[in-house]
Amino acid sequence: MTHDAAIGRLIKARTISDAWYRGLNVIWNHGSLITDERGSQIREFMNLMVVIEDPYSNEIPEDSAWNHERLEEYAKQLITGENAQDFEYTYGQRLRNWDGKVDQIEYVIEKLTNNKTTRRATAVTWVPTIDTKVDEVPCMIIDDFKIRDDTVHLTTLFRSHDFAGAYPANLYGLSKLLEYVADKVGLAPGTITTMSVSAHIYDHDWDKIEKIIKGVQ
């Protein structure tokens, strides 16, 4: 049995910038054209896995619309759970106050501190009692932390991933979250791996991304 859908690719990247450009290239050149449930045209590559060896060098792609100030604010919201702009929810709120009851980041830190080989240092953003009833739901679903060789590694699952618009900010924020957790555990931060079930580029970004892809090929 064969399938026309573009599914499955592993990218081993050195930095966040390297990951972004290489991911865009895969989606642009090998992705499928689909119309999503909101009627938007996208280029999509399913199950795109990216391993970033050094998330702390060359963090901001020069072609990204994100600047350092905006990225720092994004990272702050992710780590602290603050919602100064009164969004319907933030990832930080889901991680630090899941369903109004659980600080999952403190749970992760405790698990890692108590057992360096634990496979239970996992945080989730999906709240079924809320997210099955609304349209605006989290794209980032799971953050899983593991200690291997005295280094803390992070693996994150995105059910849906706006690779052109959001990936640089997502990874900058995740790098700061990993750094925060590793510091609390007393170890060095390591790699970040993202699994994007639907890695896509929206049609409103196509002209810009086409120029970027031509410039880096």
UniProtKB/Swiss-Prot annotation:
Belongs to the thymidylate synthase family. Archaeal-type ThyA subfamily. PANTHER family: THYMIDYLATE SYNTHASE 1 (PTHR11548:SF1). Its main location: cytoplasm. It is found in: Cytoplasm. Pathway: Pyrimidine metabolism; dTTP biosynthesis. May catalyze the biosynthesis of dTMP using an unknown cosubstrate. Monomer. Its EC number is 2.1.1.-. This is Putative thymidylate synthase. Keywords: Cytoplasm, Methyltransferase, Nucleotide biosynthesis, Transferase. The gene is thyA. The active site is at C139. It comes from Methanococcoides burtonii (strain DSM 6242 / NBRC 107633 / OCM 468 / ACE-M).
